[in-house]
Amino acid sequence: MQYGDKTTFKQSLAIQGRVINALLMREIITRYGRQNIGFFWLFVEPLLMTFFIVMMWKFIRADKFSTLNMIAFVMTGYPMAMMWRNASNRAIGSISANLSLLYHRNVRVLDTIFTRVLLEVAGASIAQILFMAILVMIDWIDAPHDVFYMLIAWFLMAMFAFGLGLIICAIAQQFDVFGKIWGTLSFVLLPISGAFFFVHNLPAQAQSIALWFPMIHGTEMFRHGYFGDTVVTYESIGFLVVSDLALLLLGLVMVKNFSKGVEPQ
């Protein structure tokens, strides 16, 4: 193919795949290095954090306060919340860390954001699968009731993480101070993510307010898949899908608008 020739959709897709793969490898090496366990930190990092939380709940004997398996309760809420929180935090620095690469005509601003969010989602997903499998094998938690329903919930929340990451990155690009305080703001959002409560246990008025937050629907859905009919959940798949698509569309528009003013350095 000669320079300047138009590419087919298949060729463009192949080029895009190579760009994302190269950015992923660069991000992994830059963040984790080539020595020791290297890229394995990608999922070891979230796994260790989740392990710490689970052990804390285990040794304070949280099961004394509920008939529900509290380790399973934590595992079906906290890791998912950390996925979208970490993804949005990492998205903020994606452009500044890759400015020099924007000289390449096939590398776009959107690619750098997508790569970082994809890395966080992949790491959180691997850690979640491994840790839940280990906990089931050592009989600390029961096997999930509906794995497929859980996978759908996780996928929809991964979409939420991408959309949120695009929006947060776009805002931080326009207002530098926002990028510095988002880490704190996202931490404050954790209590309303649904990670630490069931909507069913809230007062009726609080339930109606809580169900306006998309991440609560994702958590409720994930827990419904794990616990089955032993718990009462209030997820709306339709609301979560519409919210994800709205965030993605808004995020893409915002990134497109500010990308025009980003100059390689």
Curated annotation (Swiss-Prot):
It is a multi-pass membrane protein. One of its GO terms (biological process) is lipopolysaccharide transport. InterPro entries: ABC2_TM (IPR013525), ABC2_TM_bact-type (IPR047817), ABC_2_transport (IPR000412). Keywords: Capsule biogenesis/degradation, Cell inner membrane, Cell membrane, Membrane, Polysaccharide transport, Sugar transport, Transmembrane, Transmembrane helix, Transport. GO terms for cellular component: ATP-binding cassette (ABC) transporter complex. Disulfide bonds: none annotated. Residues 37-258 form the ABC transmembrane type-2 domain. Pfam families: ABC2_membrane (PF01061). The chain crosses the membrane at residues 37-57, 64-84, 118-138, 151-171, 178-198, 235-255. One of its GO terms (molecular function) is ABC-type transporter activity. It is found in: Cell inner membrane. Belongs to the ABC-2 integral membrane protein family. May form an ATP-driven capsule polysaccharide export apparatus, in association with the BexA, BexC and BexD proteins. This is Capsule polysaccharide export inner-membrane protein BexB. The lineage of its organism: Bacteria, Pseudomonadati, Pseudomonadota, Gammaproteobacteria, Pasteurellales.
